[in-house]
Amino acid sequence: MTTDFDAIVVGAGSVGLACGYALARNGQNVAVLERERRVGAGISSRNSEVIHAGLHYPPGSLKARFCVEGRRLLYAFLDRHHVAYDKCGKLIVATQDSELAALDALAARGEANGVEGVTRLDAAQTLALEPALRTVGALHSAESGVFDAHGYMDALVGEIEAHGGAVVLNSPFLGATPAAEQIEVRIGGDEPSTVTTRRLILAGGLQAQEMAATVHGFPADRIPALHFGKGSYFALTGHAPFQRLVYPPPIPGALGIHYRRDLGGQARFGPDLEYVDALDYQVDPQRMRYFEDYVRRFWPGLPDGALTPDYAGIRPKLH
């Protein structure tokens, strides 16, 4: 039985495009469907654009493996495709003695995960790198950095198309019906259609659960409950005296409000974590005081009134 595609990927964010690229370069006839007018319009455009080294995940877990291997592959991909990045490094900073044990645990976890370039620093060593910090010690991750996420996604689109695949915008996924040797996929948009594929990959981010529910016969008990973890960012007016990413020790469910500077030089702090019931990307100005107090734990020199609401993202949480 012939099919229209070897694989259809739903969702043209960073994950969906990476799936499309991996399939296309292995000779698969691939289409990546995206309901929006541009790629990366969801989670992939509302985050910190940080390349993590692999410190935070349990040894032996898929997250640990994918983060460490993926980080190495990502830097190589960015080099090959001339996508901008800054391997600036990251400091995870303890501001009180009670947080030092968390740094030791992260260092041990990083070693178990095979993370390169991780160094435990005392207060003097930390201040030698970033004198404006308040700290009693830190963990330095030399392999962490920031990158141009949109440039990365554009490069993935180019690779998919160069290998004969297609990225189709304005094409919402309406549902699918598996048959014996193929899957019928219903597509909306200006010209609704039904196509067939051997494989269907749902990379719909915040809509992934809804999409899975429209696949006929897919077990409902295999669709995990979704929780919206909103994170707001505040931009800094003026200059921040840091050359590296600055993070607190992680908190349950998140990495904590951190400092990062994008490739254009804009400094931001965020994200926090607020569970919400609906997709709401407005940044509440009333959260500014909380952000100021949080940031001053590690940067006591933050000027009054220097933070302004910037943007928010929503992370899909399964727990």
What label would you give each PLM region?
Residues 5-32:
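N-terminal Rossmann-like FAD-binding beta1-loop-alpha1 element of flavoenzymes
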Residues 15, 38, 207:
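Conserved Rossmann-like nucleotide-cofactor binding loop
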Residues 22, 83-86, 181, 193-195, ...:
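Active-site substrate-recognition segment that forms the wall
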Residues 58-69, 93-102, 140-159, 168, ...:
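Short beta-strand to alpha-helix junction loop
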Residues 139-199:
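Helical element adjacent to the flavin cofactor pocket in flavoenzyme catalytic cores
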Residues 49-125, 256-257:
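Dinucleotide-binding Rossmann-like beta1-alpha1 core, especially the glycine-rich loop
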